[in-house]
Amino acid sequence: MTSTLTPREIVERLNQYIVGQDGAKRSVAVALRNRYRRTKLDPSMREEITPKNILMIGPTGVGKTEIARRLAKLVGAPFIKVEATKFTEVGYVGRDVESMVRDLVESSVRLVKEERVALVKDEAKQLADKRLIELLVPSMKKETNYKNPFEMLFSQPDKEEEEDGEEELTRANLKRKMAEKLKQGELEERTVTVEVTEQNHGFMDLFQGGAGMEQMGMNMQEMLSNMMPKKKKKRRMTVAEARGVLAEEEAQKLIDMDDVTQEAITRAEQLGIIFIDEIDKVAGKNDQGANVSREGVQRDILPIVEGSTVVTKYGAVKTDHILFIAAGAFHMAKPADLIPELQGRFPIRVELQSLSVDDFVRILVEPDNALTKQYEALLQTEGIEMKFSDEAVRKIATIASEVNQETENIGARRLHTLLEKLLEDLSFEAADIHLETLEITEQYVEEKLGSIAKNRDLSQFIL
């Protein structure tokens, strides 16, 4: 599965969600297009061409993670975000770096499985409906008690068996009627008893998350749960709920997990994107103290980025063609502080700019998922048509920029805290007030946020 989008189209798609940062968008668009170009080459040349990994440099909240995440969604590529600070050098307490590849494969399996389930959705629903009819019209089987073996072998059909045949015919007619009612949606609220498989918990939870288990690439909990017999539990639920449970069970039976696993590994190897955040936190110059461990983390990451084979519970995974995007603010350190070998593995460097007032204005109104649109939609559920005036939007953007400059610069995330504070009273009272339309004006913004923004000490705690 490879995207046929051109770099220009990729940038246009990213523009729907992310404001500015054209340099970063162009770099990731070219990296993605090169993957498509690589698939068109003959196998010998294809193996030689590896992705050009990207290093994004810029403060928090300017769109580094969002660019990578949206890029992965565009092409249905497996994507994970990890933080470099969570890893430690081999021998220290903490996650080993190979776990990022295992997490990527898990993400890939989940992605492929969801796609396969979607393909068999209609068939699974039909099978679920058949099972529902069986639950709604249970069989009328009668046990015949024989006095001796000869009676069982040589007994003739009697009147009771003829009656059973009539009952079976009546039951078939009833099933047809029930099927029709089920199709019309007349039985959705009726209650049925469904037998569901119960998850095995208990002592197996002890095996979760052990660093040693991660290094073995094995999931002990899953292994033990497969050894334990599956428990069945009866649950009463409505037909509507039961259809969902039964359809899920039937879908699991219809998909071939071996095929899913194989496809997931291929997709992780060829299309996978690993986003390593806070890479600057493991960069250090000195050879003493914590920096020794930091350099150890870099040296452990190096073979993964260079290309190696990692053993996972689904099989061996090669990392040669996985795209790595590293990101960091680099306030205290510089990219040159990374070990030279790792620097060489991230040939494309992109600097993301801090956000200006105009950027904040665009972020508030332009993207498809803009914050103002989200809050307007939320209050619409209470019957209130809320709108932000252009002056109010610019005022919010100005305050966000000022607070970022005076306190910690957290980029666009500042808008979340500002809008939450701005609409706090309105969100609380919305269910009780009767307003059809409401406009958020510049004066209202000044009244709610002006004093906090001006008071530097207070803004550090509230905003």
Curated annotation (Swiss-Prot):
Protein residues bound to ATP: 19, 61-66, 277, 341, 413
Superkingdom assignment: Bacteria
CDD domains referenced in this protein's UniProt entry, alphabetically: RecA-like_HslU
Protein's cellular compartments: Cytoplasm
Pfam family, one: AAA
Biological process annotations from GO: protein unfolding; proteolysis involved in protein catabolic process
Keyword list, A-Z: ATP-binding, Chaperone, Cytoplasm, Nucleotide-binding
Chief location of this protein within or outside the cell: cytoplasm
Signal peptide: none
Record carries keyword Electron transport: no
Gene3D superfamilies, A to Z: 1.10.8.60, P-loop containing nucleotide triphosphate hydrolases
GO MF entry, a single one: ATP hydrolysis activity
GO cellular component: HslUV protease complex
Subunit details: A double ring-shaped homohexamer of HslV is capped on each side by a ring-shaped HslU homohexamer. The assembly of the HslU/HslV complex is dependent on binding of ATP.
Known role: ATPase subunit of a proteasome-like degradation complex; this subunit has chaperone activity. The binding of ATP and its subsequent hydrolysis by HslU are essential for unfolding of protein substrates subsequently hydrolyzed by HslV. HslU recognizes the N-terminal part of its protein substrates and unfolds these before they are guided to HslV for hydrolysis.
NCBIfam families named in the record: hslU, PRK05201.1
HAMAP family: HslU
Similarity comment text for this entry: Belongs to the ClpX chaperone family. HslU subfamily.
Protein name: ATP-dependent protease ATPase subunit HslU
Species this chain originates from: Shouchella clausii (strain KSM-K16)
